Amino acid sequence: RFLGNLETKRIYSLVPSVDSFVLLTKYMREKLNVGLRPSLLLEGIYNPVCIVPQKKRKKTILYTGKLDIRFGIRDLIKAFNDIDDSEFVLWICGFGLDRIFVEEAAKKDKRIIYWGVVEQKHVFEMQQQATLLVNPRKGHEEYTKYSFPSKTMEYMASGTPTIMYKLPGLPIEYEEYLVL
């Protein structure tokens, strides 16, 4: 963490000498003091992948991403546990500090299936099979103004309905394609 802070300070010290910017969110303009320097807003890059269309599985909710309390994995599992329908299934793919929490939840509730780290091509197939994709990250922390979750772009490209919180860094143009 100490080295990360040093690196961050070093990067910020170089910002005044930057002549143009590619930004993830509109809020970065102020944070980086862009001023009148040229800038381009580019939320992310998506490399289209040709996936054979998958048959939808009934009542399958999918989360792919970092397993961390800050990104809402515990909230997702708690909310899923409140669903009183044995036909619902929650698939979780990823790795992180809350891996053990997820594994324990899967042991307690057989409807929760933890896949671990999954190859990207298989993740795309799972996203097409799922009934609903979910990003449980909340927008109350400051960093969410300056980030755009790559999973949002992946989820939208899959064509599967996506539910998530309205994050500050999410452009208004995306809202009609998401359940917020």
Regions found by a protein language model. Give the residues of each.
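Donor nucleotide-sugar binding/catalytic pocket of nucleotide-sugar-dependent glycosyltransferases
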Residues: L3-I51
